[in-house]
Amino acid sequence: MRNKAFLSALALIIISVLFISCGKSTKPKKQIDTKPVSVKQFDTPPGADPSVSAEQGGEGFKGEGWETKTDYNILGDPKAIKGGPFNMRIPDFPNTLRIYGKDANSYVNNLMENMVYESLLSTDPVTEDWIPGLATHWKVSEDKKQFWFRINPNARWADGKPVVAEDVVATWKLLVDPGILEAYSNILYGTYEQPVAESKYIVSVKTKELNWRQFLYFAGSMR
């Protein structure tokens, strides 16, 4: 009987301790520094390169014969308060921090890619129409096998250097390089001819096959 009473008392003590430990924590919350981080090295003036003509996508570009959109919906609320912590669940741990190549297809890598790099075009979250991204204007040939994009002259890399048409060409070359060990990208982007930087801000590409998805893939994923 004594042993039973002792065990009962011990059980009550343990349960009480567990309840107390599960109570409110007095540990202060960790303060997160949300100050902006900058790696800017170059002070490139805003706007287009003065040496590039309007016809070649520079200052004064009219966009006649091109498509664009200035009135469109965006995700999120523009009135949202900036700054502060943002908690989210990450379901996997990346094997690499590359956004292309072997083992790059993970939740974290895709998240970082969309946060760091902007695609040529995006889609309106309500109407699903094409809207500007890295490119302000776009154009499709009559046979639907050649596409043109005009890079936003105000686009800048994190270090301050301007984004130019040659950067799009460089991305395509990377995606078709067998050395990245990503057969899917090699095959998909191999269905296009090498893009051409027609000027500092205008890049064009021809597709090897007639398919409505070809514009979708290039405009929506090329960065």
Residue map of PLM features:
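Bacterial N-terminal signal peptides that target proteins for export
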Residues: 1-9
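C-terminal motif of bacterial Sec signal peptides marking the signal peptidase cleavage site
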Residues: 18-21
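Bacterial signal peptide processing site
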Residues: 23-25
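N-terminal pre-domain segments of enzymes
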Residues: 28-81
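N-terminal lobe/hinge region of extracytoplasmic solute-binding protein
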Residues: 53-74, 84-142, 173
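Extracytoplasmic
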Residues: 81-85, 115, 133-135, 142-146, ...
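Aromatic- and charge-enriched surface segment that lines or borders ligand/interaction sites
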Residues: 136-181, 204-206
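Surface-exposed binding/hinge segments that line
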Residues: 186-223
